[in-house]
Swiss-Prot record:
A motif (YPX[LI] motif 2) lies at residues 427-430. Transcription factor that mediates regulation of both acid- and alkaline-expressed genes in response to ambient pH. At alkaline ambient pH, activates transcription of alkaline-expressed genes (including palB/RIM101 itself) and represses transcription of acid-expressed genes. A zinc finger (C2H2-type) spans 70-95, 106-130, 136-158. Residues 46-61 have a biased composition (Polar residues). This is pH-response transcription factor pacC/RIM101. It is found in: Cytoplasm; Nucleus. The keyword S-adenosyl-L-methionine does not apply. One of its GO terms (molecular function) is DNA binding. The lineage of its organism: Eukaryota, Fungi, Dikarya, Ascomycota, Saccharomycotina. It comes from Eremothecium gossypii (strain ATCC 10895 / CBS 109.51 / FGSC 9923 / NRRL Y-1056) (Yeast). Keywords: Activator, Cytoplasm, DNA-binding, Metal-binding, Nucleus, Repeat, Repressor, Transcription, Transcription regulation, Zinc, Zinc-finger. Gene3D superfamilies: Classic Zinc Finger. SUPFAM superfamilies: beta-beta-alpha zinc fingers.
Length: 432
């Protein structure tokens, strides 16, 4: 029996061929199911990538693993993208092409797929089988839409709100801190003198000078506060006339920047925030907490001192003989006038030694510094949230601008359908 237990508990006793046969008969695991038609797997290294050699590389790779990487499998293209929308736009523009450009491809070459179509909108609709596209969601309020045109119209609300909030703030107030702790006069002067930038000018002129990280050496956080959102009444601009790859790089830049800014936000909620059940968690006050703990240990009560012999027999326990205290006449007690000239010795004074004064000053300085740092952290968090909202609006706006033409062609109805739809009536006509 012990020999059987030894065989069951040891891995070396099971031959490798048996392990391989069990692995072949086992059903598909959840990790294998993650390999979809887009050709990617979570936590799988990209072919040709190198292992990190420093702690900074390890943290960067860990952050990148949080977001899935998409590989283009059209004729072994191998291009890598961070968003399904970017991969879908790459397929429609670079591989499917257009008839006007004489590079229209109506047959699917994704992996082993051999689907054939007769129109461009048919092949673009078929590509959604291979690309894990999701409904277009607003990064600010998480509302979802079927088409980028609908999301683009919805973004007008957030653009107007952001412009109103910026107009209420005083000019130059974003570069000034509320507390005495600041970043330096040179950085504040630079923040005040930075010119306002439009989205088109930032993408065409300034974007190549920055890395998509919030706290970089180029002070991208100060430049973001001076970007002017496009007017809600005229969504479009000069980016529509730029090459598709140009806008695609801008979408990838703001997507990576939004992910980096979201990671920098504090993930811990305040102490008095509602818990998962929706109840308010209140911490006890210090005086209430320490009031429950007795200051001195409990002592048994002593019997009262009495002088009458009748009361003594009832109050005092048996077997104990206590003698009453002798009475002292009042004439023998000293008068209080003798201590009148020494009254100043018993009055509390606010006089401290040099060491006590130094320790008090250090405690006051530490408290003021802690309060200033807390206010500075709150100001930085508020500024980060406001700038993250601006970055998300720009990201969604550029994504809608990128895929607007593709979805317009896919959702267009034939002329015969539109003509027949115009003749339909809401209620049937009744003939008498």
């Amino acid at each position: 029996m012990s020999h059987i237990n030894h065989l069951l508990n040891s891995d070396e006793a099971i031959p490798s061929t048996a392990l391989r046969s069990c692995a072949q008969r086992s059903p598909m695991s959840s990790d294998d199911e993650l390999v979809g038609t887009a050709g990617y797997r979570e936590n799988q290294p990209v072919p040709g990538s190198t292992l990190p050699t420093s702690p900074s590389d390890v943290s960067t790779d860990t952050e990148n693993d949080e977001h899935q990487r998409l590989l283009c499998q059209w004729d072994a293209c191998g291009s890598e993208f961070s968003q399904p929308e970017l991969l879908y736009h790459h397929l429609c523009q670079d591989h499917v092409g257009r008839k006007s450009q004489r590079n229209l491809q109506l047959n699917c070459h994704w992996g082993s797929c051999t689907t054939k179509t007769v129109k461009r909108d048919h092949i673009t609709s078929h590509l959604r089988v291979h690309v894990p596209l999701k409904p277009f969601s607003c990064s600010t309020c998480s509302r979802k839409f079927k088409r980028p045109q609908d999301l683009k119209k919805h973004l007008k609300v957030h653009m107007e709100d952001t412009m109103k909030e910026r107009s209420r703030a005083a000019p130059g107030s974003r570069g000034v801190r509320k507390t005495g702790v600041n970043k330096g006069s040179a950085l504040q002067e630079k923040a005040r003198t930075l010119p306002n930038l439009t989205v088109e000018s930032f993408v065409s002129q300034e974007m190549q000078n920055y890395y998509p990280y919030y706290k970089s050496r180029q002070h991208l956080d100060e430049t973001l506060s001076h970007i002017i959102l496009p007017p809600p009444a005229a969504l479009g601009g000069t980016l529509a006339s730029e090459p598709p790859s140009y806008t695609r790089k801008a979408v990838s830049f703001f997507t990576t920047l939004s992910q980096d800014m979201s990671r920098r936000l504090p993930s811990l909620a305040p102490c008095n925030s509602p818990g998962p059940a929706g109840k308010m968690v209140m911490l006890p006050r210090p005086e209430q907490q320490y009031a429950r703990v007795p200051r001195y240990p409990a002592m048994p009560e002593l019997p009262p001192l009495v002088t009458s012999p009748g009361a003594e027999s009832h109050a005092l326990p048996r077997g104990h003989n206590f003698r009453p205290a002798p009475l002292i006449p009042g004439s023998m007690l000293p008068s209080l006038s003798r201590f009148s000239h020494d009254k100043s010795q018993f009055v509390a004074r606010n006089s401290y030694s040099l060491n006590q004064k130094a320790s008090l000053n250090e405690e006051l300085c530490e408290n003021e510094l802690d309060i200033a740092l807390e206010n500075l952290a709150l100001d930085d968090t508020d500024a980060l949230r406001a700038e993250l909202q601006t970055v998300n609006i720009i990201k969604d706006y550029l994504t809608c601008l990128l895929l607007e033409d593709v979805y317009t062609e896919s959702f267009e109805l034939p002329a015969s359908v539109e003509k027949s739809h115009s003749t339909l009536r809401k209620y049937p006509q009744i003939k008498v």
